[in-house]
């Protein structure tokens, strides 16, 4: 069969083998996929041009981060935008090694890496390189969000080059495997950097109830992950009679004190990303996409889709780095919003959700938690976290949370929580049984809680009554998984399906060394996880 493209970086890839037709499962066209490969090849060549430098300039680092972020699933569907990014990468390489373009001798500095070499490689080499590539793509998103708040880490920037070089020129399992785990190590630093950036800029998240009711009148829906974009929009809409509602991974913004002070930040609209084409259908308001996940818009709302930062879609109005949101504001006033209040619900019928249980909030009750564990009031902790998606089988996570014992605590983060975050699970000792820790990058906070509990009980994280039940969809989930592996976390349950880019040998390595297992049924997995912790 003639392959029009090849991509297997997301959980929904066709047949759990790879998208090869005229378009991917995510909606990107084959031409777009080929441009993403060309961009990745250019980035590998730029990393080669850096040639082991210990001091990556801020400019070079930012270009690499932007290029990697552009290739994350559901970020950029616009070929012109990607072509411009490719030229930006090539221009930076020319700036670093200007004589290379004049040289007639082929070498790694003059030739761009052809991604077909990776896709055609030995399956174990391809698997390890894919883990590195998809991991640093996810990590680039976190680095980007930190950078826009003027936080950066030279070690993180330097590692992007190191990892890209290994993708292009690493030749053995023995050399690639340490880099896979180092992605997890550096991603931990990157998530810590973003946690610092967010909390020092917007304050420590506080437990906060968020309504799902949409008030009548003009409003704007903000989706994605970028808190700075939300801040700027709130500032530009203040006093204009326009309400702002979060969507998807922007929900945790309600917990930050700086953002909470805006009275027109009203609540949350809708559920997770994969439901947007239904939920945004004929929406009487504009939608601002700050990051993934963007799905190709339906005609019923395409005229009210606005993108910014690295997000782009053909025909959508893009808000550039000047951050003048006037077109979005004018569209909100033109559409006018709903004529009456709309009482919406979560997937399970709840009319509100709660967020803001970051690591600081939970650890402020550390004494209560430790005593509850010692007394037997809390028997187990479940971290049920990760991405949501459209693939059948994800209702597993709803049923899993529903069936967790009444003497257990459920921690959650990322958009997978929309499967169950409107459930009322009650309390233990004044603490809610279900605690939303934030966005996917707030996995850093979950790690801090786990480490603090292990210290309190004088044991390792693996010896805690704590189980990781994860869902994945895109590349940020990959870098988080690699961070957990770097920390030695074992017996993770992963679903709804295992990554197509894991070869049998590499998967077997993860099973034998880390006990990774696919999800089965909620009943069987809960029983097995509780028995394992005894």
Report residues per predicted region.
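Electropositive, gly/pro-rich neighborhoods at or near active sites that engage anionic ligands
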Residues: 43-201
């Amino acid at each position: 069969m003639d392959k029009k493209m090849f991509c297997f970086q997301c959980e929904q890839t066709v047949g759990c083998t790879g998208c090869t037709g005229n378009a991917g499962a995510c909606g990107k066209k084959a031409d777009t996929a080929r441009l993403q490969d060309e961009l990745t090849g250019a980035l590998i060549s730029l990393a080669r041009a850096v040639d082991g430098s210990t001091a990556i300039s801020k400019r070079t680092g930012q270009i690499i981060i932007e290029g990697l972020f552009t290739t994350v699933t559901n970020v950029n569907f616009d070929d012109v935008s990607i072509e411009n990014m490719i030229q930006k990468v090539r221009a930076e390489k020319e700036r670093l090694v200007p004589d290379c373009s004049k040289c007639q001798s082929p070498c790694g500095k003059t030739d761009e890496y052809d991604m077909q070499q990776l896709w055609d490689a030995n399956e174990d080499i391809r698997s390890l390189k894919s883990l590195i590539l998809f991991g640093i793509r996810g990590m680039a998103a976190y680095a980007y969000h930190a950078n826009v708040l003027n936080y950066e880490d030279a070690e993180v920037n330097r590692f992007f080059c190191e990892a890209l070089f290994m993708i292009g020129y690493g030749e053995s399992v023995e050399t690639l495997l340490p880099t896979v785990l180092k992605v997890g190590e550096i991603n931990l630093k990157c998530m810590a950097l973003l946690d610092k950036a967010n909390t020092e800029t917007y304050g420590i998240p506080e437990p906060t109830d968020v309504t799902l009711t949409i008030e009548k009148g003009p409003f704007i829906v903000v989706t994605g992950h970028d808190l700075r974009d939300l801040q700027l929009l709130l500032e530009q809409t203040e006093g204009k009679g326009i309400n702002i509602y979060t969507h998807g991974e922007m929900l945790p913004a309600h917990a930050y004190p700086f953002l909470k002070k805006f009275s027109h930040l009203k609540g949350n609209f809708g559920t997770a990303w994969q439901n947007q084409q239904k939920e945004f259908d004929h929406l009487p308001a504009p939608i601002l996409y700050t990051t993934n996940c963007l799905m190709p818009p339906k005609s019923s709302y395409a005229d009210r889709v606005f993108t910014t930062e690295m997000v782009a879609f053909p025909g959508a109005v893009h808000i550039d780095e000047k951050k003048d949101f006037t077109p979005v504001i004018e569209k909100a006033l033109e559409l006018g919003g709903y004529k009456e209040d709309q009482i919406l619900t979560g997937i399970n019928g709840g009319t509100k959700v709660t967020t803001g249980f970051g690591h600081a909030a939970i650890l402020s009750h550390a004494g209560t938690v430790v005593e509850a564990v010692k007394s037997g009031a809390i028997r187990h902790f479940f971290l049920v976290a990760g991405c949501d998606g459209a693939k059948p089988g994800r209702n597993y996570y709803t049923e899993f949370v529903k069936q967790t014992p009444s003497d257990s605590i459920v921690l959650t983060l990322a958009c997978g929580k929309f499967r169950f975050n409107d459930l009322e699970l009650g309390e233990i000792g004044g603490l809610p049984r279900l605690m939303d820790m934030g966005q996917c990058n707030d996995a850093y906070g979950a790690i801090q809680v786990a480490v603090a509990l292990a210290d309190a009980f004088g044991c390792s994280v693996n010896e805690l009554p704590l189980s990781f039940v994860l869902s994945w969809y895109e590349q940020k989930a990959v870098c988080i998984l690699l961070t957990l592996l770097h920390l030695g976390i074992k017996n993770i349950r992963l679903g709804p399906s295992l990554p197509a880019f894991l070869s049998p040998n590499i998967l077997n390595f993860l099973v034998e060394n880390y006990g990774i297992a696919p999800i089965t049924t909620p009943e069987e997995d809960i029983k097995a996880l509780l028995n394992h912790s005894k």
